[in-house]
UniProtKB/Swiss-Prot annotation, chains A, B:
Binding annotation for D-glyceraldehyde 3-phosphate: S140, C141, N142, T171, H195, G196
GO biological process: glycolytic process; lysine biosynthetic process via diaminopimelate
Annotated NAD(+) binding sites: T13, I14, G111, R169, Q300
Organism for this UniProt entry: Methanosarcina mazei (strain ATCC BAA-159 / DSM 3647 / Goe1 / Go1 / JCM 11833 / OCM 88)
InterPro entries named in the record: DapB_N, GlycerAld/Erythrose_P_DH, GlycerAld_3-P_DH_AS, GlycerAld_3-P_DH_cat, GlycerAld_3-P_DH_NAD(P)-bd, Glyceraldehyde-3-P_DH_2_arc, NAD(P)-bd_dom_sf
Protein name: Glyceraldehyde-3-phosphate dehydrogenase
Gene: gap
Pfam families given in the database record: DapB_N (PF01113), Gp_dh_C (PF02800)
Length: 335, 335
């Protein structure tokens, strides 16, 4: 079988994880990754055997740093069937003409607007809608984490209303510039946060309100989720529905915080201590009549990675069944 | 007028603030404060002119440290009309026999159970119920902050349901032992947190569910509050109701986090940068039909201080009208 040729434009927090996850599949391969500067991430990409591409204007800096380049970003794009754009939020939009000119398919991350791609993706919620598409946006970590729980509950019980408070990690572990380091920041102060509307880009009929806080931690986000449903249910019903989802993982055995979740991922030998699943505490599932609550933690660096692999598979029509793609992706990365 | 004689048993985070706030009133005075160890707080209490009392068994340590004592804790209690017990949560209960033996009135903090005093106090919600009582519990910072907003909304619009997510500061600024320093801790994992039931100790008929997270910050708690009410209303209505409360302060003018609230308190010359008021962002007040949301920040070290002064005034029957006591307390401390 000829593998689908995938390029990753922007080998940063998400891009490097997407590259490794794609490379682990048997129906797609990485033909190149791009980096603007010859930093430690570029050096490791080269050591791992990825062909490295950079803007033509920066080739001198790579040469000086002793990191060999395989060509320019335009040349990388020309070689690919599909480009996963993992450049910082807002930058990806400017790359659209380049992808169109080269006639390649493109995936953007949740930092870009829905309108740029015209289709926002979550594997469990709308895989089939992405089949054969040229342009897809994989929604952000928090939106992915919420779609993964809202979709199966809506299918089985009918969702009347969702209310979420998101405690967001201030920044990623490798960032030494952003804060806060000792404050709570309602972000935004004016409700709702963008997450509620963003869920609607995948699940348009869901009535949802979200409020977000930025807090001094780097490891994971944490959601307090409240859902009203249209059907009588028990905590056991919710538990059963979540248990049926391969990308939901229950937390117990002394895991009482995001710190212990990450320690679990480290102990499991997960690459970069990634936790691709929603981490839900089953003990927190509490039902009052047709309304329930629970806590879930979301690993911002990695949760969209398996979704991106599934998006590639749908767009390249390598698999028409979403459930089969999810299973295949999971197995290949060790989820 | 003879001033009511008040002792503070436990001159720590809350106790030292209560002592200063009582001393600022014209109808009550501090006749002594107690400390178990001769640390820097004891030294400052002495420098400020408070008579200092300690357990008889620790008098040698105070002598050695050069901090003069006025007597034992039992002797302090004997001199008082009313003791404010600010010992750590759970310790206060053991002091009840001592207060009963001395025939003094007693106030406990929210760390003790409701049953210990049989009456849980919030000035705006139930001042009159404390008139002449011998034993009162002033509810905790988070419960106080919630009573202050729930009571006036319930009176004007009727509260159908309250849902709160509390992002709790991990510990106070002077604590060097507790964490987390980089994690989010659902605390407790099993819902509801104790805050919901605790609100009912003041406002028994309120339907409320609370979920709490412990996060790496020391400055303030932050609540995401959702309320369903029985009456049609607008954001302006909510704004007007909150504006009528002297212990609610609106945040604007570039105050976007708890860090900036504390900076405001420092700039205002507040003692120990205390922010006695609920800090609400009016921009966050969002109404959907008969349901609204808002953010409020709560200064855990100081919010119960004016409430404690009002509780004293009610129990000593120095003022029969709660609104007048609140006004008098506020004016004396500069709120």
């Amino acid at each position: 079988m000829v593998k689908a040729k995938i390029a990753v434009n922007g080998y940063g927090t998400i891009g490097k994880r997407v590259a490794d996850a794609v490379q682990a599949q048997d129906d797609m391969e990485i033909i190149g990754v791009s980096k603007t500067k010859p930093n430690y991430e570029a050096a490791v990409a080269h050591q791992k055997g990825y062909d490295l591409f950079a803007p033509a204007s920066n080739s001198g800096a790579f040469e000086k740093a002793g990191i060999p380049l395989a060509g320019t970003i335009e040349e990388m794009v020309e070689k690919a069937d599909l480009v996963v754009d993992c450049t910082p939020g807002g930058i990806g939009e400017a790359n659209k003409p380049m992808y169109e000119k080269a006639g390649v398919k493109a995936i953007w991350q949740g930092g870009e607007d829905h309108e740029l791609a015209g289709f926002s993706f979550n594997a469990a919620s709308n895989y089939e809608g992405a089949l054969g598409r040229d342009l897809v946006r994989v929604v952000s970590c928090n939106t992915t984490g919420l779609c993964r729980v809202i979709y199966p509950i809506d299918r089985e019980l009918g969702v009347k209303k969702v209310r979420v408070t998101l405690a967001r990690r201030a920044t990623d572990p490798n960032d030494i510039k952003k804060g806060p380091i000792n404050a709570i920041v309602p972000d935004p102060i004016k409700l709702p946060s963008h997450h509620g509307p963003d869920i609607k880009s995948v699940l348009p009929h869901i009535n949802i309100t979200t409020a977000a806080l930025k807090i001094p931690t780097t490891l994971m986000h944490l959601h307090t989720v409240n859902m009203e449903v249209n059907t009588d249910c028990t905590a056991e019903d919710i538990n059963r529905i979540f248990s049926s989802q391969s990308r939901i993982r229950f937390m117990s055995q002394g895991i009482n915080s995001t710190a212990e979740i990450i320690e679990l991922a480290r102990d499991m030998g997960r690459p970069r201590n990634d936790m691709w699943e929603n981490c839900i505490w089953p003990e927190s599932i509490t039902v009052h009549e047709r309304e329930f609550y629970f806590f879930q933690a979301i690993h911002q660096e990695s949760i969209v990675v398996p979704e991106t692999v599934d998006a590639i598979r749908a767009m390249m029509e390598l698999e028409s069944d979403g459930a089969k793609s999810i299973q295949k992706t999971n197995k290949a990365i060790g989820l």
